[in-house]
Each structure stands twice: as C-alpha cells, then as structure tokens.
C-alpha cells in the first residue's frame, strides 16, 4: 500500500495537522502550572481547566443518540456479553484514559449454581471494570456476580456497584452524583453526558504495570455521533445489527465529544476542560476471533473537529460456522461523515504483529489512507471470551503516531482534491484475538448475500416506533 502524499492541485492547500513534540509524557507544556494538591495526591491541570463538571440528567431525546445505545440483554439463557469503551484524551500532557466495562451472561446474576451448570453447561459470569490510563498503566476490578449491575434498555446508561455503603442500597439506575457517592463505595455509573466512579485493583493483573485505585468525575458534551451532524445517526454495522446475526455486533456511540472534569490516577490528579472524548460498545455471543482497531480524535492543527475510527476482524455470522472479515473506516470532519464500508466500497488493511497499522478505503466519492505506528510495547487488556471469561486477549497503546489523508475521488478513480491531511501522536491502537503468527493483510471479503442485505436502507427504529416493541438495546 503506497501511503506517500499525493500531489494536490495547485490551487488547493490541504489542511494539515501538526504533531505534538515527543516530550516526556508527564512533562507539562510551558504555561501549565500544577495545582497544589489538597492531600497526598499530586495534580495536573490543563491550561484551560477552570470549570468543574456539571451534572445534568440524561434527556429522553438526544439529537446525536445513535442506534444501539441501550443494553441488549434480552433475558434469555443464550450466551451473551456486552462491553462498553469510553476514552478521554488530554493533549496538553499527552495522556489518555480508557474506561472499559463488561458484563457476561447476566442471566446468572449471582453466578452459576451447580444446577445452572447442569442445565446450561458451565459459563463465565460477572462484571468487569478496566482502565488503561496515564503512561499505559492499568487497573482492573471484577466480580463474578452481576446482581448490582444495571443498564438502560434504550439509552447509553449503565452502572455497577462492587461495594456499597452498608447503610444504602446499590443504585439500579442513573442517580445524581451526590447520591451515587453516598451509596457506592466502589463502582461506576456512566451516561452519554456524565461519568463517575471509584475502583480498586483486585490484584489479578500483576503481569502489567498497574495502579491501586482510580477515581473520576466528568461531564461530556457530544460533538459527533455516527453520521452527519444534521442527519439521523447511523448503525455502525447496518440494520441487521438489530438482530442476533453477527458475533459480535459493534456500535460507535460518540465519535467525538468534549469532556470536563477530573481523574485521580496513581496518586496524581488530572483536571481538564473540553478534553476530546469517545465511546463505543459491542455485544453478542462472543468476541471476534481476531481483530485490529485504530481510534483518534486528537489532531492538533487541523481545522474543525476531526475523529477517526477504523477497525476490522474475523467474526461469525448466522447460526452456522461461517466467518467473515469485515473492515471499516469512519471519519468525522467539519460536521460531515465519510464512511468506508464493504456495502458501499472497499477497505484494505496491512496490520503487523505489533507496531504497524495501514489501511485504505474508497467509496463512490472519496479515497482515504491511514498509517499508524508505535514504538511502545503496549499493554495487555482483558476481553470477555467464551473459552475463559474476562482474560487478557488484546494489546493496546494510546501513544500511536498516525497520519490520516482524505481525498475527493475523480471520475477515473484517482485522487482529486485533498480534503484532509492530519497527524497525531495520541492514536489509540489495538490488536486482539489470534493467533497472530504473522501480519495480516487483505481487502474486505464479505458474504455477497449478507453484503446486499446489510446495504439495504432499512430504518428499524422507524418501523418499531413504540419503545416496548423495539429489540433490547435499539
């Protein structure tokens, strides 16, 4: 794949991002003064961090709400997991925090009894909370029970109580932050516009650099969902995602947002205002066999808000033993959405064992090329697997160097006007599953019948306007 810069038209000046200097990660840029800590916790404050997070209850009708924002568990005994991912990046100190939550087989809220194992075969159950934070350090807390987990059927709202105040009952829905702090000693709650919690490492992950505790509280203003800002937001995997057809399904819930608040991490307090943020989720009977992933919404110097999400994997389709290797690139820029998916074009990838991610795509109107690298060793993260439960299954870093180039497509298929040429050194990069004996190179090859079905414009939400008729999660 040739990722050299194409010669632009003489009259066109591409919008180019500027890479942040490779300074020490904890080195605060000039003009940033750490605040005095109120206790033994040291403090970092972003240059603009003056505002405190403001809690607002989640409104019923959000303009940027995507399909599949809700919790998809249908109450049946089929194998099931759901996972959520929320990322906040602080460009001023080149640090990111990635919050990951998962629930496995929630039908068995107290774990599986001997009778359950006899009737349904042994399965892994429970709720996990992971954070990949500053300096790629890690924390994880897990419980085999999900009786204190809750999720909204139709909105991006969920929470869990690992340890409650003995004088209070665990919340079973969104509550004001003061109420949460009073009732929950260890746990979390998150909505599209509010996120808070406190977790304690349970000692299961001593194979990576970890921290003992993390506490956070921040509000978020969504900027992009998944689609044009002024249009109805889209299902990432098409309308078939409303049914248990793919294993797993995937949805970007917020391609970009601006978050304000604070995170306490390993004895250091990070305060921020309007920090770039992101959220996505997946659900189904099991994780892909193998996958790769790129996400970045920190592009200094680029005009307007820019967000990139690109990924692919080997996943199961239907009830048989059939697998496909779909791949996707989605770009939000200046309010517009540029989508490269199998049902509208082609996507190619060239992924190394670790350290190199190359992707390109084309649709009827545009061409895109992505190259990302990292010299970091990466951190092993956990994923809910059918075979072993929540175990190390992927490797991530938030210190990827990335270049994103987007062109208009000429009538002959060649590159036309360059729309965007942006760079970053804060890309989140991941490879997972396996085995990864070698690199992985290919072009989207999907089942043609499935491709035609997925590409059919069907608005499932409009077909089922009454909430209780909608499938869970939609």
UniProtKB/Swiss-Prot annotation:
Enzyme Commission designation: 5.5.1.24
Regions annotated as coiled coil: none
Iron recorded as keyword: no
Single GO term (MF): isomerase activity
Location of the protein in the cell: Plastid, Chloroplast
InterPro entries registered for this protein in UniProt: Tocopherol_cyclase
Pathway: Cofactor biosynthesis; tocopherol biosynthesis
Location, primary (coarse class): plastid
Superkingdom of the organism of origin: Eukaryota
Catalytic activities: gamma-tocopherol = 2,3-dimethyl-6-phytylbenzene-1,4-diol
Pfam families named among the record's database cross-references: Tocopherol_cycl
Tissue occurrence: Present in all green tissues, both in bundle sheath and in mesophyll cells.
Record flagged with keyword Transmembrane: no
Keywords, alphabetical: Chloroplast, Isomerase, Plastid, Transit peptide
Functional summary from the UniProt entry: Involved in the synthesis of tocopherols (vitamin E), which presumably protect photosynthetic complexes from oxidative stress. Catalyzes the conversion of 2,3-dimethyl-5-phytyl-1,4-hydroquinone (DMPQ) to gamma-tocopherol.
Protein name (database record): Tocopherol cyclase, chloroplastic
Organism of this sequence: Zea mays (Maize)
Gene for this chain: SXD1
